[in-house]
C-alpha cells in the first residue's frame, strides 16, 4: 500500500533486450581470446570486434560504475540486470590513455546514448586485442538468456540478447 502511495510501486519489466554497444563484428563469448571471458568466469555475454571507436549504452538504465582507467563501464537496468562493457582486452594497462568517458556514475542512460569514445588504432597497437566483451555480471539472477548469433552489429540498433530476470 505504501509503495502505491509514494509512487514506488511501478511494475518493473523482467524482460530486457540488450543491444550492441559497438559497431563491428559479433564474437561468441567462447571465441574471446581471454580465458576469464571465454570461460564465462564473469558471466554470460558476447564480444564485438569494433570497427569504430564509440561505445553507446546497450540498455536503458543507469551508469553504475565508471572504471578509473576508463576501459570499462558497469550499467544497471531497472529490473536488476547488471552489465559490464569492457573495451578491448588487457586495456586496464593503458591507464586511461586513448579513452574519453562521456558519462558519470549515477547518470541515467537510454539505448544508444554515447558512453565512451576511444582511439581504435591506439588500442589496436597497444593492447592485447580490441575485441570488447559485454558481460551480464549477475547471470545467476537471470531466468533465461537468449543470445542471437549475429555477424555484423550496429551500435544501439542490433538486438543481441534477450534476458528475463528472476
Curated annotation (Swiss-Prot):
Cellular component GO terms held in the UniProt record: cytoplasm
Signal sequence bounds: none
Residues annotated as site: Important for phospho-donor activity: 71
Residues of the PTS EIIA type-1 domain: 34-138
Main subcellular location of this protein, as a coarse class: cytoplasm
Pfam families named in the record: PTS_EIIA_1 (PF00358)
Cofactor dependence: Zn(2+)
Compartmental location: Cytoplasm
The keyword Phosphoprotein belongs to this UniProt entry's keyword annotation: yes
Residues the record lists as Phosphohistidine modifications: 86
Keyword list, A-Z: Cytoplasm, Kinase, Metal-binding, Phosphoprotein, Phosphotransferase system, Sugar transport, Transferase, Transport, Zinc
Active site: 86
NCBIfam families the UniProt entry points to: PTBA (TIGR00830)
Alphabetical list of PANTHER family matching this protein: PTS SYSTEM GLUCOSE-SPECIFIC EIIA COMPONENT
Subunit structure: Heterodimer with glycerol kinase (glpk).
Annotated domain remarks: The EIIA domain is phosphorylated by phospho-HPr on a histidyl residue. Then, it transfers the phosphoryl group to the EIIB domain.
Name under which the protein is recorded: PTS system glucose-specific EIIA component
Organism per entry: Staphylococcus aureus (strain COL)
Highest classification ranks of the organism: Bacteria, Bacillati, Bacillota, Bacilli, Bacillales
Amino acid at each position: 500500500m505504501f509503495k502505491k502511495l509514494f509512487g514506488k510501486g511501478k511494475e518493473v519489466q523482467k524482460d530486457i533486450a540488450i543491444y550492441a554497444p559497438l559497431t563491428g563484428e559479433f564474437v561468441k563469448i567462447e571465441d574471446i581470446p581471454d580465458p576469464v571471458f571465454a570461460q564465462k568466469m564473469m558471466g554470460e555475454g558476447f564480444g564485438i570486434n569494433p570497427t569504430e571507436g564509440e561505445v553507446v549504452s546497450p540498455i536503458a538504465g543507469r551508469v553504475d560504475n565508471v572504471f578509473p582507467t576508463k576501459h570499462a563501464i558497469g550499467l544497471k537496468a531497472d529490473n536488476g540486470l547488471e552489465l559490464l562493457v569492457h573495451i578491448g582486452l588487457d586495456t586496464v594497462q593503458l591507464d586511461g590513455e586513448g579513452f574519453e568517458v562521456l558519462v558519470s556514475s549515477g547518470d541515467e542512460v537510454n539505448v544508444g546514448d554515447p558512453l565512451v569514445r576511444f582511439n581504435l588504432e591506439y588500442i589496436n597497437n597497444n593492447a592485447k586485442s580490441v575485441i570488447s566483451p559485454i558481460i551480464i555480471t549477475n547471470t545467476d539472477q537471470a531466468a533465461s538468456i537468449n543470445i542471437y548469433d549475429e555477424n555484423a552489429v550496429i551500435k544501439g540498433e542490433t538486438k543481441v540478447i534477450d534476458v528475463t530476470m528472476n
